[in-house]
Amino acid sequence: MPRSRSRTADLVWYERADGGLRKQPVQERSRAVVEQILEAAAELVQDSGFEAVIGSPTLLLDRTGVSRGSFYAFFESPEHVLDELCYRQMKDSTATFQQALDARRGRRWNEIVDILVDYYAEEHRTPLVRELWVRQNLTQRVRALDELCIDDWAGRVLDQFRRHAPKFDGLTRLHCSVALHALERLAQFAFTDDEDGDPAVIDQARLMLTQFFAAHAGK
């Protein structure tokens, strides 16, 4: 007898996991306080770096302009603020990534590779992403969320390739996950010393992914 899927298994990653909030703000004023804290933290990360945020709670508190009580009502620590920032970044990216996939013509499977590479390159041009992901300034919580996010994206990429059936009938979610992990590492490499991304590395990433998926295409 087949095992029934649980409701939890059907949820996307950000519905199964939380960010860094101690509790969800309910009132409009509370939501404004949370947004104020997150905006200040993002600015501080970009201006002074990851270490400045987690190394001095006072520095972050001064930048936010909110009271200590209001801050700790929603966040246990500066690290949890960054957890929430990263959580929202990944959640927003998941939505816009899906929009990019949905907008493709669907005539050639190579379009999927182009969307992947172009999307990752554009994401890494964001200062916050470069400071946190490229420099690997991620908490253990965010690393776990990142794995969930990549697995989710792998499923979305597989769905796109399945539209070219039967050509990619042998392609699996694991294959797509491997490709995404490789692309993430190459994007980090491309943006380590170049805020616009080293075009040669980006081109090689495109070539590698094209050849990788071509190797999994049926005759």
Where do the protein language model's features map onto the residues?
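Basic, helix-initiating cap at the start of DNA-binding domains
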Residues: M1-E51, L59
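Hydrophobic alpha-helical connector segments
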Residues: E84, Q98-H124
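Helix-turn-helix
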Residues: L44-H80
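Secondary-structure edge/capping motif, primarily at the C-terminal ends of alpha-helices
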Residues: F97-R105, E131-N137, A187-D194
